[in-house]
Amino acid sequence: MKSEKEKTSKKSAVLDWAKAIIIAVVLAVLIRNFLFAPYVVDGESMEPTLHDRERIFVNMTVKYISDFKRGQIVVLNGENEHYVKRIIGLPGDTVQMKNDQLYINGKKVSEPYLAANKKKAKQDGYTLTDDFGPVKVPDDKYFVMGDNRRNSMDSRNGLGLFTKKQIAGTSKFVFFPFNEIRKTK
């Protein structure tokens, strides 16, 4: 027969394990829902920056502690799916594209992340981004575009503008496939 002390010791060990598992699950849920979350890039709209089926980690705290910045790659919560795009226009901005040059509030804006796409477009005899605008971004919205401008549904052509509440967070790095791990810029 087992002594009372042995029974209490086993019971205590089981309770300790149960507490540890419950704490781990609660922490995982909190981290996943409020700090960082994995997302899958769906489609080619962010090529060559991000590729179809890559997995990215998204910082979800940004929207609670600071404002979004122009040029950040964000995950947007649409009606039925999420989208990965780049913030181009901030609330209150006027966005225009003319002769493959982005203008924000009437000033030229450099887009170094488009260098490879612009070079290929020029070699193929077309512009990367069709002219549009000027578009005035309302005070509570963001204007977004994909880096693969010829193959991206975004604020120009169907997705419209997004509120801060619709932005899940900012992309920090690609974590899969493992041979492609890198920071996103």
Curated annotation (Swiss-Prot):
User: Which cellular component appears as one GO term in the record?
Assistant: plasma membrane
Bilayer-crossing residues are 21-41
**What biological-process GO terms show up in the record?**
signal peptide processing
Keywords in alphabetical order:
Cell membrane, Hydrolase, Membrane, Protease, Transmembrane, Transmembrane helix
The residues exposed to the Cytoplasmic compartment are: 1-20
GO MF annotation list: serine-type endopeptidase activity
Q: Where is the active site?
A: 45, 85
- Report the subcellular localization: Cell membrane
* Family label: Belongs to the peptidase S26 family.
Q: What is this protein called?
A: Signal peptidase I
What lineage is this protein's organism placed in?
Bacteria, Bacillati, Bacillota, Bacilli, Bacillales
Question: What gene name does this entry carry?
Answer: sipA
